[in-house]
Amino acid sequence: MVKSTRHAKYELYYHIVFIPKYREPRLMGATKERLKTIFAEICDDKDLELVEVEIMPDHVHLFVGSPPRNEPSLLVNWLKGISARYYNQRYDDRIKWTRSYYVGTAGSVSKDTVEQ
C-alpha cells in the first residue's frame, strides 16, 4: 500500500535477517513469543509497519515497512539493539545478536508506475 509524508509518496519494505551470537538455536517457545511482542513494540514506537515476523530457532526474519527517512542500517540497529536491551531488562535469560545481518528490498514497480 502506498503511503505518504508531506513531500513524498512511498512504498518501502525491507526483508531483514539476523542471528543470535554463536548461532545458538535458542529462539523457541517463550523466547520466540517474547521477541515477537518486543519487535511489535519497537515498530509501533518507531512508526514502522511490521508486516511479518518469522522466528526460527537460530535466526529471525522480519518484513518491515518504513518511511524513506529511515535508512536500512538504522532499522536493523533499532530492531537488534532495542530488542536485546528490552529482552535482557525484562527476562532472566539473555539475548545477544551478532554484528552481521542481511537486508533486502521488496516491492513492485510496474512500467505504468514509472511513466506516471
Over which residues does each language-model region extend?
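Basic nucleic-acid-binding interfaces
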Residues: 1-116
